[in-house]
């Protein structure tokens, strides 16, 4: 059985956070959810986080600053930034994926998470092939 991946979810909107947490947990992920970026950053420092999903606009530290702080600690951690603002994505952000709230289906978020986790893990290692003795190649 493969170990469950842990996703750090951050959103100051408790309803959105609760929905996202339930959606991810029912798909087999462990979820650490926080309404404050500062608390989420402290949890991240404890380790065992595989991916970050955060809202963009929050009181205190906003989503892009949270992602930057996390990537200062662990540069290869995948991060998804979600915004309710339908504005142009801030290309200075270190997020790997940007999703406009209300403009994506839950299945889109789940697929992005899956792809980012696969990319983080890297390609499956191929087992070296055992050379076949001459004369057996193509023999049935």
Residue ranges and their predicted role:
Residues 1-6, 107-140:
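Non-catalytic signal-transmission and effector/linker regions of two-component phosphorelay proteins
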Residues 14-32:
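Two-component/phosphorelay signaling modules centered on CheY-like receiver
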Residues 33-51:
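Acidic, metal-coordinating helix/loop segments flanking the phosphotransfer/catalytic sites
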Residues 35-36, 62-65:
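Acidic catalytic/metal-coordinating carboxylates
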Residues 42, 64-76:
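Short amphipathic alpha-helix used as the core "switch/output" element in two-component signaling
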Residues 55:
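Active-site residues of response regulator receiver
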Residues 58:
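Receiver (REC) domain active-site loop signature in two-component systems and cognate sites
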């Amino acid at each position: 059985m493969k170990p469950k991946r842990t996703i750090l979810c951050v959103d100051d909107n408790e309803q959105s956070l609760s929905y996202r947490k339930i959606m991810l947990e029912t798909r087999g992920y462990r979820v650490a959810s926080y309404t404050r970026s500062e608390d989420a950053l402290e949890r991240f420092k404890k380790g065992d986080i595989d991916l970050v999903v955060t809202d963009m606009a929050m009181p205190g530290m906003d989503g892009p600053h949270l992602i930057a702080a996390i990537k200062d600690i662990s540069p290869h951690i995948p991060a998804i930034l979600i915004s309710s603002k339908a504005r142009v994505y801030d290309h200075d952000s270190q997020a790997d994926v940007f999703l406009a709230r209300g403009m994506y289906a839950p299945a889109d978020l789940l697929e992005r998470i899956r792809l980012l986790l696969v990319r983080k893990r890297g390609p499956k290692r191929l087992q070296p092939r055992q050379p076949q003795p001459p004369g057996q190649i193509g023999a049935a």
